[in-house]
Amino acid sequence: MRIAIVLNTSWNIFNFRMNFVRHLLTLGYEVHTIAPYDDYTHLLEEAGCIHHNVRMDSRGANPLKDSALIAELFMIYRKVKPGIILHYTIKPNVYGTIAASLLRIPVVNNVCGLGTVFLKNDAISFVAMMLYKISFRFAKKVFFQNPDDLNLFLEKKLVSPAAVDLIPGSGIDLKRFTPTSFSRNEKFTFLLISRLITDKGILEYIEAVQKLKSEGIDARFQLLGAMDPRHKRGIKTEVIQSWINSGTVEYLGTTQDVRHFIQQADCIVLPSYREGTPRTLLEAASSSKPIIATNVPGCNHVVEDNYNGMLCRLKDADDLAEKMKQMQRLTDVQLLELGQNGRLKMEKEYDESIVINKYLQTLHDLTPAS
């Protein structure tokens, strides 16, 4: 059977869906990946996928470009003739579903997170909801990554209750992200891993760090992730450089493997505004690291306050700084317990096999009996 997997970047497929893709290939599925070409496309092809390039601007909303995207996806779908199409991220979910409906190809969508668009009551939010409502009536199944997003879509009647299901994000590979022996750093180390955009709480993190330093708190404050100044909520390069030059944070750049950086930190921080299920927190918890995250949808399902980490208030740098102080004051035994609890939570609730099995069951249910 031919399966199409559609995302906004090849990088996303390789980093978050590759074990699922390999599983499909092992089972004999013909897997077609559809995403813009990038540095990871050849890795998909080397794994056995048949790749199709698509022009997709994931950054903005341009009606003309988005209309062209529907047409382009329609042409690809008509050529490939997949039995089922799996969409991830906003534009494939919306425009890909519309294109597939014209060809009557069954679609499975994955709402990876709503970002901040649904937090506002403006024209953009209204248009986004209308697009979801129009497109999602054609989806056979819609997976959500946290119950808050699922309930929001049901309350606003954007999706049929019969079509929805819940999965723990993309899951986590428990064999890849494993704990190391506990060893507290001589200088307590906080690490935030994220693209450098405001929605991830970067500005609150920096403000909290500045507050802690002004109080004489002796710790290391690190930042790992790509600069993205072209993003509409990206932080300007010169601003980031000023943080580096002033010694506010240690900027670690980017990496293709975060495991070493997670392992050398004492605590992982993510004061994000809203998430689906943040991969960074799954990786941290699976590695038995204590976490500080915002008490918002997505984050507060991965982090249980005072069980495997601490929750701080949204957009509140003072509260974040207070939680960071509390974390640093914990004894080795308390830090170890938080980390171990996080690992147990991942094993029980977030093993990627849970996600893979739900998708396989859905594919089975949607496959016509021969």
Which residues are covered by each model-predicted region?
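Short His-centered aromatic/hydrophobic patch
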Residues: H87-N93, V111
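A short, well-ordered alpha-helix in the C-terminal region of glycosyltransferases
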Residues: D319, Q326, V333-E349, V355-Q361
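Aromatic "clamp/platform" in nucleotide-sugar-dependent glycosyltransferases that forms part
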Residues: T254, Y273
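Conserved acidic donor-binding segment of nucleotide-sugar-dependent glycosyltransferases
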Residues: D305-N306, M310-D318, Q326-D332
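A conserved mid-protein helix/loop that constitutes part of the nucleotide-sugar donor-binding site
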Residues: N15-N19, F188, L192, I197-K211, ...
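Short, structured helix-loop element that forms part of the nucleotide-activated donor/catalytic region
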Residues: T41-E45, E215, R220-T248, L252
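Short hydrophobic beta-strand element within catalytic cores of glycosyltransferases
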Residues: P290-A293, V303
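Donor nucleotide-sugar binding/catalytic pocket of nucleotide-sugar-dependent glycosyltransferases
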Residues: H52, K133, R137-P179
